[in-house]
Amino acid sequence: MRGSYWFKAKSKKVLFEFSIQRNITVIKGDSATGKTTLLHILYEYLRMGRQSGYSVSTNAEYYVYLRDEVGRDWKDALYHLKNTIIFIEENNEFVFTKEFAAFVKESGNYFVLVTRAPLKMLPYSIHEIYEIITDGKRTDVKESYHEFREIYSNYPIIENNKIQNIVTEDSNSGYQFWRHVFKDSRMISSNGNGNLIKQVKELKTGDMLVIADGAAFGSLMESYLNAFRVQSSRRISLWLPESFEYLILKSNILKSEKLMEIMENIPEYVDCEKYESWENFFTELLVTMTADGVEKRSCTGI
């Protein structure tokens, strides 16, 4: 399954409009923010059509899973589905299991998961974490996090922002690149996104820029923000581009009309059955685009 899909779901009182473009989308937020209402509208329309009193317009096949039924669990309900956007209601504990993560990876479906807790088994993007925002009768599904998020606001004067330390999750070509870019700062690799907090804590002084791949960072976002907020004696900025490979592909270093077309329409080229996250897609695309040229690149070095 690939591509971007849109939904318009409404009742007499509320209207939801949103699009889904990756294999994993997370909807979070407090109670009474519209999450259950959205899934209820989608479910009842799927079950009864216009007789439900609701209206749903979409260019996708979809399914809504609310809870286990007697004699039928989530595997019975979901395993046969193909090329479908599957919405899963909150409080279904199976979404935190390795078995479900394997199903997401292999099924070829898109998943919209309602949960307040991070899904640590799944590699989802910071750009696919949403909250439902209500403005009168119109309800929008808005992105919770953005590509660059400033952790602290206690350094309002830009010339005071002297970054002494750069920490990146990459230990290979990305690390080499950032070391050249930030040659006047201390450059450190955490050897993976799971070690970033530890590395930041070990660097006890100095303002810091932390660079990680946003395409698969979604489950870590909340815990990292909380960990960095308590470091109140210094400024910590967290930058999460899709991936290092993505930055190269978008830089116009590689002159290719085909590449430009792909980068302008990424959802149309990422087959979720083949690529667990966009990060995997960008890595393969960069290797493919540079395989025969002078800009030959590997995962371990430039």
Positions of PLM-derived features:
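Structural recognition of the conserved hydrophobic beta-strand(s) that form the central parallel beta-sheet
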Residues: 87-89, 108-118
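Conserved P-loop NTPase "ATPase switch" module shared by AAA+ and STAND
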Residues: 65-98
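Post-Walker A alpha-helix
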Residues: 38-40
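Hydrophobic anchor at the beta1->P-loop junction of P-loop NTPases
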Residues: 27
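Post-Walker A helix-loop "phosphate-sensing" segment adjacent to the P-loop in P-loop NTPases
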Residues: 44-55
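Conserved glycine(s) of the Walker
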Residues: 33-35
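Acidic, divalent-metal-binding catalytic cores of TOPRIM
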Residues: 92-93, 127-302
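N-terminal pre-Walker A segment at the start of P-loop NTPase domains
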Residues: 1-16, 140-144
